[in-house]
Amino acid sequence: YYNSLNTDLNEISKVGNGQTWDISSVSGGITTYTKYELPTKGNYGYLYPQATYFINEGGNSEVYYKSDDTGIKLLGAPSASFINPGIIEKGEIRPPIFEIKTPMNVGDQLNQTAYLVIDIPVSIIPDSLLNTLPIKPDSLRLKITTKYNYECTGSGILKCPGKDFSVLQQIANITTISNAEA
């Protein structure tokens, strides 16, 4: 197993145009898949009217995207309220960020900063928590700042078990900072 994995890690470190990354010898006992569905089939599609599809990541975990000729943008994901878990909050990425940008070529870089913002109504926050604050806010917002830096470092053929794919290789550096605002 180690020799196979080590060989495959060496394969994916190659950069530049015209590469062949051969990971066809990798095997495992688990099969996973991702199902893309229309937003109207999601429990929270109404929160993301501009979405073109969503991915259900299990249970009520849904992630909404918009796809057009510029690429695929992440719009957000609803989540249970931190204060009242029975309430679902709209987790919105501001501005929407590219998961995939098109066209993209070897040497291209993409640097983005996005904010996942969850507005929390003060009415659902217990007074015992609000009374500990120096001022009484009229609203609260959870803000998660994420910086995405992508570089397209290679292109070629990815040989997988059972099928080959034409691919672009990316290196991604992602940094996240969380804070609450009143």
Please give the residue ranges for each predicted region:
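Conserved functional acidic sites
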Residues: 1-182
